[in-house]
Amino acid sequence: MNNLLLHFFCVAVGGAIGASARFAMVLAMQSFGVRAFPFATLTVNIIGSFFLGLLLAYAEQQPVSETTRLFLGVGLLGAFTTFSTFSVEVVALASQGELLKAALHIAFNVIICIAAVFAAMMLYSTTVK
């Protein structure tokens, strides 16, 4: 298998797993009656950001193959997190007059996801050294 085909395969398989995991998270949260605020999107974005932060921190210390980076970072975590769904949810909340919820959704996703990346990188650097 040539490298380009292998790279597409890694992204596709990782993406299928990530998208399926995101769908499972949404279903799980809906089964608990969580619908008033888009917590499922927030949750997957925080978790995905955290694990992407771990991957980045690990890659700074240890060699990570291109196929692993593509499978985990681009495929699995790229499909698990969801900026497009986040954007649609913000517009839907705003269109329904839920401006505070829309603003909170933006703030929580941006601030908490960036904090999750930072926390993961700090956690990795303090536990590995």
Swiss-Prot record:
Notes on how activity is controlled: Na(+) is not transported, but it plays an essential structural role and its presence is essential for fluoride channel function.
Gene Ontology BP term (one): cellular detoxification of fluoride
Residues the entry annotates as binding Na(+): 78, 81
Record's catalysed reaction(s): fluoride(in) = fluoride(out)
Subcellular location: Cell inner membrane
GO molecular function: fluoride channel activity; metal ion binding
InterPro entries attached to this UniProt entry: FluC
One Pfam family per UniProt: CRCB
GO cellular component: plasma membrane
Membrane-topology annotation of the record: Multi-pass membrane protein
Stretches that traverse the bilayer: 8-28, 36-56, 71-91, 103-123
UniProt keyword terms in alphabetical order: Cell inner membrane, Cell membrane, Ion channel, Ion transport, Membrane, Metal-binding, Sodium, Transmembrane, Transmembrane helix, Transport
Protein family membership: Belongs to the fluoride channel Fluc/FEX (TC 1.A.43) family.
Chain's role: Fluoride-specific ion channel. Important for reducing fluoride concentration in the cell, thus reducing its toxicity.
Protein name: Fluoride-specific ion channel FluC
Gene: fluC
